[in-house]
Design a protein with these regions (language model features):
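Conserved beta-strand scaffold positions in the cores of enzyme catalytic domains, especially
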Residues: 6-10, 294
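Conserved aromatic-histidine-acidic binding/catalytic patches
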Residues: 7, 109, 182, 186
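Interdomain hinge/linker elements that couple catalytic modules in large macromolecular machines
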Residues: 10-157
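Core-facing hydrophobic residues within beta-strands of well-ordered domains
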Residues: 5-6, 276
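A generic structural signal for well-ordered coil/turn residues at beta-strand boundaries
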Residues: 5, 123, 141, 228-229
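A cross-kingdom feature that marks ATP-driven nucleic-acid transaction machinery
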Residues: 143-295
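Residue-level detector of alpha-helix boundaries and kinks
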Residues: 4, 29, 74, 88, ...
Length: 295
């Protein structure tokens, strides 16, 4: 009232462990559910009213009568002026256009025109700007734009591309899309959860700073350029250790093989030579063998 406030509260998303308790889930199902609903209690409540994740998807999201079918548009109405352009940008990013140049090409307009709407979406928490570990966040050349909110990410990957099928009540093409791509989608959310789990936490007796991804070109053992990527990379607060991680949301993996490859890639990084390298595997299932550092 009168533009005055005693306190302003910015409510963050509720974290993963609580959805397991709220919906009485095992760890694996909790991660899959969180990949869809994120940390919004209202979405959890809607999920709780259905018998299964599949039932909840069809009842709430994948139906024209679903409570959440138009959810992103409703959220944008409160905070953005050009809802159509905003949703279009989110659609392109959700379906794989992650570089500024790619988004601009899909939008058919100069990249400079997108700076303001992209920043707005980041400020609202819908997008995140992803840059490799150790790179200044202002480095536009290396930046990738990703949808930050799990529900929004699911919506723009599975709902928007299939909207015509949803509106015609055609379940089969949507079921095929979910069967083909849902596990891959969860794996991307799993990576983010793993980075969050490392950030600021004690891992094997060492506290680490902000965990990020790293990708780029290195010179390999054969003196040839090689593109490498790390799902998780974090520096210890005492700057002695560099944690490098591989995330897998698949069936049993060969832990020793993954660890060996992690160390091989890490030893190719010039900036890593000043650290003690700590390899870490983040696996959906226990590895086939004893792999050392696994979570």
């Amino acid at each position: 009232l009168y533009g005055r406030a005693d306190e302003i509260m910015k409510l963050a998303l509720i974290r993963l462990p609580y959805i397991q308790e709220a919906l009485s889930l095992d760890a694996m199902n909790a991660i899959e559910e969180y990949a869809v609903w994120g940390g919004v209690p209202r979405y959890w409540e809607l999920r709780e009213n259905q018998n299964s994740l599949n039932d909840a998807l069809w009842h709430n999201i994948l139906s024209v009568n679903g409570t959440l079918y138009e959810e992103p548009i409703k959220l944008f109405q409160d905070d953005v002026k050009d809802i159509v352009k905003t949703s279009t940008i989110m659609s392109y990013i959700g379906t794989g256009a992650n570089r500024l140049s790619e988004i601009a090409a899909r939008c058919n307009e100069p990249a400079t025109n997108l700076s303001r709407p992209l920043k707005k979406l980041i400020d609202l928490g819908f997008l995140a700007k992803d840059v490799p570990f150790g790179i200044d966040e202002k480095n536009a050349k290396k930046s990738l734009y990703k949808i930050a909110d799990p529900f929004m990410a699911f919506y723009y990957q599975f709902v928007v591309p299939n909207r015509s099928f949803i509106e015609l009540g055609r379940r089969l093409p949507i079921e095929q899309a979910l069967t083909a791509h849902f596990s891959e989608y969860v794996s991307m959310q799993w990576e983010k959860l793993c980075r969050d789990a490392v950030t600021g936490n004690l891992v094997n007796g060492v506290v680490y700073g902000k965990a990020k991804r790293w990708w780029g070109s290195v010179i390999n053992e054969d003196k040839k350029p090689e593109q490498v990527e790390f799902d998780v990379m974090a520096e210890s607060l005492d700057k002695k250790y560099l944690l490098v991680g591989e995330c897998k949301w698949t069936t049993q993996e060969n832990g020793k093989q993954l660890t060996t490859e992690l160390l091989r890639k890490a030893n190719l990084l010039p900036f890593a030579k000043k650290y003690t390298i700590v390899p870490m595997l983040f696996l959906k299932n226990a590895p086939k063998d004893e792999a050392g550092n696994t979570m």
